[in-house]
């Protein structure tokens, strides 16, 4: 779970018997501490590892990447999804969503909506990933990398 925030998706996945282990990656130490506290309260702390960066996980390939409500906050979201592609194998799935919009009255001031950045993101997405059906979360899109 990249940019996992308060841990909603990481904890839900950790509670699933179908999930072996979850890596919660967030640059914010307060978030990591809070989710670790929640994991202990829920009894799933052994199924989670808390990291500041993807590199800190020391995992070369992931089965699933969850990145929700994060890409629109990055200066170069295209580079990030290229990085994700590099840590996926041919059967991996990435769950993404985004909202590249600052709002009509700057309601979302921390969102990226520069047209060149957004266009580069979509070009990168479409040339590196294939959208696939998934029953996991209807507000996201699931992608596998193009071989």
Predicted regions and their residues:
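Conserved beta-strand signature within the Rossmann-like core of class I S-adenosyl-L-methionine
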Residues: 91-99
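Conserved Class I S-adenosyl-L-methionine
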Residues: 108-133
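Class I SAM-dependent methyltransferase SAM/SAH-binding core
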Residues: 21-45
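A short glycine-rich, Lys/Arg-flanked "PGG" loop and its adjoining helix->strand segment in the class I
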Residues: 79-90
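Conserved SAM-binding strand-loop segment of SAM-dependent methyltransferases
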Residues: 44-54
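Conserved beta-strand/loop positions that form the S-adenosyl-L-methionine
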Residues: 2
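Conserved SAM-binding loop of SAM-dependent methyltransferases across substrates and taxa
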Residues: 6-18
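A conserved beta-strand element that flanks and buttresses the S-adenosyl-L-methionine
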Residues: 66
